[in-house]
Curated annotation (Swiss-Prot):
Any Pfam family: Ribosomal_S17
One MF annotation (Gene Ontology) recorded for this entry: rRNA binding
GO cellular component: cytosolic small ribosomal subunit
NCBIfam families in the cross-refs: PRK05610.1 (NF004123), uS17_bact (TIGR03635)
Similarity-based family: Belongs to the universal ribosomal protein uS17 family.
Function statement: One of the primary rRNA binding proteins, it binds specifically to the 5'-end of 16S ribosomal RNA.
InterPro entries: NA-bd_OB-fold, Ribosomal_uS17, Ribosomal_uS17_bact/chlr, Ribosomal_uS17_CS
Naturally occurring in which organism (per UniProt): Corynebacterium glutamicum (strain ATCC 13032 / DSM 20300 / JCM 1318 / BCRC 11384 / CCUG 27702 / LMG 3730 / NBRC 12168 / NCIMB 10025 / NRRL B-2784 / 534)
GO biological process, one term: translation
Organism placement in taxonomy: Bacteria, Bacillati, Actinomycetota, Actinomycetes, Mycobacteriales
Protein name in UniProt: Small ribosomal subunit protein uS17
Domain of life per record: Bacteria
Gene name of the record: rpsQ
PANTHER family: 40S RIBOSOMAL PROTEIN S11 FAMILY MEMBER, SMALL RIBOSOMAL SUBUNIT PROTEIN US17M
Keywords (A to Z) from UniProt: Ribonucleoprotein, Ribosomal protein, RNA-binding, rRNA-binding
Protein transport in keyword set: no
């Protein structure tokens, strides 16, 4: 396999998540609340669970309330493993 194929396969396995920015007070870092919905195996009820993750925002363009898309990446710091891809919708 060539290096290009290996890089494409590696990029395709990265998780892409969507969530709302809840904090932008740090430099080049945003906190994104990602919601996960799962259906209960027996009863079928939809269960919601939310998790806050830190993401790298190089240009510092995201603000509180923005709907953003983030991608998993190599560890950038102790608890920053995601990178901002795009802002889907700006806050009003």
């Amino acid at each position: 396999m060539s290096e290009a194929n290996v890089n494409n396969q590696e990029k395709s396995t990265r998780k892409v998540r969507t969530g709302y920015v809840v904090s932008d007070k740090m430099q080049k870092t945003i906190v994104v609340e990602v919601e996960d919905r799962k259906q209960h195996a027996l009863y079928g009820k939809i269960l919601r669970s939310a998790k806050k993750v830190k993401a790298h925002d190089e240009e510092q363009i995201a603000g509180i309330g923005d709907l953003v898309r983030i991608e998993e990446t190599r560890p950038l710091s102790k608890d920053k493993n995601y990178r901002l891809i795009e802002i889907v919708e700006k806050a009003k």
